[in-house]
């Protein structure tokens, strides 16, 4: 069976996923598209040679009789309504982050999915599909380094634009760590604090950069995450797990080691899309396979809710300077195991 997908949102991310579905992945095809800018939708159909209907409204895509699953890559504040509509129609939906712009919105999706009685939602957190993170989790789960005690992490971007604001260090950047570190450790966060080192001269006047986020998990694991979005030298993701009897480190992406002109060097990537391109492929293929097999296994609506609650606490911590509690609702039995 070829899964027939409707895509809502044909901007950069939407078109990148359309490219995957059309040229890279197997078992699916795009049969419907929509974008707030009709020309964007037409351009996507032309560029990728789609045999797809262009709809003027995203809800029409959800309701279309030939659409079996929905891909939501539209503007963030529209995600909640489209995901809820897909659940109401009983159609599986892959939603790029954020699942909703508030924790309350995420909880409405959780409640709708639980009421439906079957998992329909996968959230677009791709790092759990990165082979480096998967290898790191295998080491942690094996017990080889003992119980994790501390994590030292960094998320560095070469630079960001003028529109990037201090809170976006949490909602656009740290959000990936909030998801993947919770997945690595298999437990929720208990508190968050944000501290500000000396500001880099490369940051815009309105942006606090770098920032250090301090997290504590329910069992007492301490995590520090450096967010430095104007580091200048490249795109660099680091994660070191300190255990009771050893240390495990996220491997850097493969790169040629160069010895030349009395120097030894390794190239560092500058683009986040290049760093995680394979992960995007794997996560979307997992969604296709999960729908076809009748069981989604990727990041759930509950994972989207958990990330939103933690992000809200981190933003409060940015503003208060205090240690902020991270209080989540009780996890429904629907999402356990």
From Swiss-Prot:
Keyword Oxidoreductase: yes
EC number(s) stated in the UniProt entry for this protein: 1.1.1.18
Keyword rRNA-binding included in the entry's annotation: no
GO molecular function: inositol 2-dehydrogenase (NAD+) activity; nucleotide binding
Catalytic activity field: myo-inositol + NAD(+) = scyllo-inosose + NADH + H(+)
InterPro entries from the UniProt entry: Gfo-Idh-MocA_inositol_DH, Gfo/Idh/MocA-like_OxRdtase_C, Gfo/Idh/MocA-like_OxRdtase_N, MI/DCI_dehydrogenase, NAD(P)-bd_dom_sf
Superkingdom, natural source: Bacteria
Signal peptide: none
Keywords carried by this UniProt record: NAD, Oxidoreductase
GO biological process: inositol catabolic process
Pfam families: GFO_IDH_MocA, GFO_IDH_MocA_C
Family according to the record: Belongs to the Gfo/Idh/MocA family.
PANTHER family per record: INOSITOL 2-DEHYDROGENASE, PTHR43593
Function: Involved in the oxidation of myo-inositol (MI) to 2-keto-myo-inositol (2KMI or 2-inosose).
SUBUNIT field: Homotetramer.
The name this protein goes by in its record: Inositol 2-dehydrogenase
Organism: Burkholderia cenocepacia (strain HI2424)
């Amino acid at each position: 069976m070829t899964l027939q997908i409707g895509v809502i949102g044909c901007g950069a991310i939407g078109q990148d996923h359309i490219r995957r579905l059309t040229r890279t992945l197997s078992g699916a095809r795009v049969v419907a598209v929509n974008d707030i800018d009709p020309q964007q939708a037409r351009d996507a159909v032309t560029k990728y040679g789609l045999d797809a209907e262009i709809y003027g409204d995203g809800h029409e895509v959800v309701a279309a009789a030939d659409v079996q699953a929905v891909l939501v890559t539209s503007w963030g504040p529209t995600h909640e309504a489209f995901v809820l509509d897909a659940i109401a129609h009983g159609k599986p939906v892959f939603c790029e982050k954020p699942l909703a712009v508030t924790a309350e919105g995420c909880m409405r999706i959780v409640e709708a999915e639980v009421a439906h009685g079957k998992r329909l939602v996968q959230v677009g957190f791709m790092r759990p599909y990165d082979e480096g993170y998967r290898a790191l989790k295998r080491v942690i789960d094996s017990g080889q380094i003992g119980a994790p005690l501390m994590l030292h992490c960094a998320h560095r971007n070469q630079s960001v634009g003028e529109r990037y604001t201090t809170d976006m260090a949490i909602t656009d950047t740290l959000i990936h760590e909030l998801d993947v570190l919770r997945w690595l450790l298999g437990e929720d966060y208990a508190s968050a604090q944000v501290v500000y080192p000396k500001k880099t001269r490369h940051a815009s006047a309105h942006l606090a950069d770098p920032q250090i986020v301090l997290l504590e998990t329910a069992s007492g694991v301490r995590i520090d995450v450096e967010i430095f979005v104007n580091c200048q030298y490249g795109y660099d993701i680091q994660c070191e797990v300190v255990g009771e009897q050893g240390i495990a480190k996220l491997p850097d992406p493969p790169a040629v080691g160069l010895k030349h002109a009395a120097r030894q060097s390794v190239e560092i990537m500058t683009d986040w899309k290049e760093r995680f391109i394979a992960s995007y492929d794997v996560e979307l293929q997992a969604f296709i396979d999960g729908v076809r097999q009748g069981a989604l296994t990727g990041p759930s609506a509950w994972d989207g809710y958990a990330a939103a609650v933690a992000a809200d606490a981190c933003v409060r911590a940015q503003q208060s300077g205090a240690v902020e509690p991270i209080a989540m609702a009780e996890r429904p039995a629907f999402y356990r195991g």
